A protein has these predicted regions:
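Membrane-anchoring hydrophobic helices of lipid-metabolizing enzymes
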Residues: 1-82, 92-94, 101-105
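Catalytic core of membrane glycerolipid acyltransferases/transacylases, capturing the structured
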Residues: 35, 80-137
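A short secondary-structure junction signal
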Residues: 92-94, 119-121, 162, 168-173, ...
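Hydrophobic/aromatic ligand-binding patch that stacks against planar heteroaromatic rings
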Residues: 98, 149, 186-187
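Surface-exposed cleft-lining segments at the edges of enzyme active sites
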Residues: 128-139, 167-175
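Short amphipathic alpha-helices and their capping/turn segments at secondary-structure boundaries
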Residues: 143-153
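A structural motif
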Residues: 153-164
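A cross-family acyltransferase "interaction/gating" segment
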Residues: 156, 168-243
Length: 243
């Protein structure tokens, strides 16, 4: 089995020094734990669609529906799932797990670095949020086109409209998404897709918000995503389905 590099360090977004900082902090704060869990998971061959329910069990995550009615996910037809993005990795895993219980024809638009897991490649439509050069802009345009085609083929698509993890204005405030992008609304209009809005309760820890909001340091913020994921093992997560 090839060694998997659990890291948010991206050659397209970060220079060598930034990648070194991110990888060092990740290694110190949780990377080895996640790699160990993945290694134990990947020993046995499994169906790709089972990855989502399996990983929720391995991470010992409990998912609680706070809605006054059962979660309703159409089993067929174009569907866009939109949600706030308070955690980074865990909320994406939860959404994919929930959708996978009803259908296998779904994809998630998410950070391109998450393709480091081979099990995710089939499901990910990669986005480079730096959008800072011709190559990354081209990739993002291709991803947007693929997303539209996928919906036109009656697939399901998971999107975090903010395009970034929720942050708090100061260390005592609740975390909020950045302003939502117009792209999901355009997709809904163009593809006539059903929409499933989800709201997650919670936020990341003090260190993340210190780096993201107080210091406004993107490199240090990225370095905490693995740590935040490790911290969230064996915990309960609540969501509400909006009408």
């Amino acid at each position: 089995m090839n060694k998997i590099d659990f890291s948010y360090a991206s050659k397209s977004e970060h220079n060598l020094a930034q990648r070194l900082i991110i990888k060092t902090i990740e290694t110190i704060t949780g990377k080895k734990k996640l790699e160990k869990l993945y290694k134990s998971y990947s020993i046995n061959t499994r169906k790709p669609i089972d990855f989502w329910s399996d990983i929720i069990k391995i991470l010992d995550i409990k998912i609680l529906n706070n809605s006054s009615y059962p979660l309703t996910i159409p089993s067929e037809g174009p569907l866009i799932v939109i949600a706030n993005h308070p955690f980074g990795i865990i909320d994406g895993l939860i959404l994919c797990s929930l959708v996978s219980e009803r259908r296998s024809d779904f994809k998630i638009m998410t950070h391109e670095t998450l393709k480091f897991l081979p099990e995710l490649e089939k499901f990910i439509l990669p986005v480079d949020f730096s959008n800072k050069n011709r190559e990354t802009k081209k990739q993002n345009i291709e991803t947007a086109t693929k997303a539209k085609h996928h919906l036109n083929d009656n697939g399901a698509l998971i999107i975090f409209p903010s395009g970034s993890v929720s942050t708090a204005k100061d260390l005592k405030s609740n975390a909020q998404d950045d302003e939502w992008k117009l792209f999901p609304a355009k997709l809904i209009h163009q593809t006539k897709s059903d929409v499933l809005p989800i709201f997650f309760d919670g936020k990341n820890g003090l260190l993340f918000h210190l780096f993201a909001s107080k210091l406004k340091n993107q490199t240090l913020k990225y370095s905490t995503y693995i740590h935040e994921t490790k911290k969230k093992l064996a915990k309960k997560y609540q969501f509400t389905q909006a009408k």
